[in-house]
């Protein structure tokens, strides 16, 4: 299978720090970014325009975009210089996970940058797949 690494990105400061961390990767990066605008995330998603996605655009092997506001995020990546035709956009967390599983070679890893509720949605789907456990369960 593939390895998934989740790094919470809920504001420009955190997202930019995550992106700088990704620059330490030697290989090209399979990146998935999810943006929700639910109450726990904050309704205003204009902060995505303050994130320096341009830092990693040239380092991406693939880009998958999801969440309730996936199309806003796709537009932001378009303006960062990433070609729209090369993005895979799916609002569905399950659809995003299925795409990653089918498009990334076994043994490779994907980095996932979700907002808070998108992380909860992803963990719920991963739990249903048997790939992780619920937060409150002991390992």
Residue ranges of predicted features:
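ATP-dependent carboxylate-amine ligase
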Residues: 1-139
């Amino acid at each position: 299978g593939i390895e998934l690494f989740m790094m919470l990105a809920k504001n420009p400061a955190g997202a930019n720090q995550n992106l700088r961390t990704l620059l330490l990767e030697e290989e090209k990066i399979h990146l998935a970014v999810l943006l929700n605008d639910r109450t726990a995330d904050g309704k205003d998603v204009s902060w995505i325009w303050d994130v320096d996605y341009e830092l990693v655009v040239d380092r991406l092997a693939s880009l998958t975009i999801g969440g309730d506001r996936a199309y806003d995020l796709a537009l932001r990546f378009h303006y960062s210089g990433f070609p729209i035709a090369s993005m895979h956009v799916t609002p569905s967390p399950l659809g995003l996970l299925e795409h990653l599983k089918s498009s990334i070679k076994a043994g490779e890893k994907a980095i996932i940058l979700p907002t808070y509720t998108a992380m909860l949605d992803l963990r719920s789907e991963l739990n249903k797949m048997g790939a992780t456990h619920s937060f409150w369960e002991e390992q």
